[in-house]
Amino acid sequence: MWKNIGRYPVHNRMLCAAFGVCMLLLYGFHLARFRLGGVLLDEVGDLATILALLGQFSPHQLWVHIGVTVGLDLLFPLAYATLFGGLIARGFGAYSPALLVPLAVLVGFDLFENLSQLALLLLTLLQAAPATIEIIAAFKALVTPIKFSMLFLTSAISVMAVMSLGIQQSLRLWDFGRARKLQKRH
């Protein structure tokens, strides 16, 4: 299956829909950041900062954060995986399976981070033992930098895929123009 992934057609509609969903989810994150006072726990990878933020959140902010994590943050990996995966498969064709590995790692670590974040928020809301919260926060602090590293790598691969698509389209247009000139001569 993996060796044939580059052969699956990636339609413009699907890519446009995935892009639109990503933009809507990013706007939702922006609104949530505003309601939470400027910082989302999803963006923090330092243990001390995570614990400090959890201590500063009011119960209302914890509930808003739980809603963001369950609603937006669980859908976002699916949306960007569709967008990035489609661009990579379309831009690199037969080479795409190897180039999709960072995306798969990214989605896995993002989902691990979301689950640990949800556990942190719920345990903080329930006023669980600080040692329990600290253990889960330490796990999140390990996972978040890996997630962002894979996000940067996957984004770079996606940009190269878009550049590849642009070059392919330019070559097709150049060949078409050349063929028309040859046709006029004969």
What feature does the model see in each segment?
Residues 169-186:
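Short, highly charged, low-complexity non-transmembrane loops/tails of multi-pass membrane proteins
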Residues 92-127, 184-186:
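Hydrophobic alpha-helical transmembrane segments of integral membrane proteins
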Residues 109-173:
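Alpha-helical transmembrane segments of multi-pass integral membrane proteins
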Residues 67-88:
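Hydrophobic alpha-helical transmembrane segments
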Residues 5-8, 89-97:
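Membrane-interface helix-boundary motifs at transmembrane edges
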Residues 27-44, 74-77, 107, 111-119:
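Transmembrane alpha-helix/helix-exit interface in multi-pass inner-membrane proteins
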Residues 2-67:
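Interfacial loop at the N-terminal end of multi-pass membrane proteins
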Residues 10-17, 64-74, 97-108, 138, ...:
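Alpha-helical transmembrane segments of integral membrane proteins
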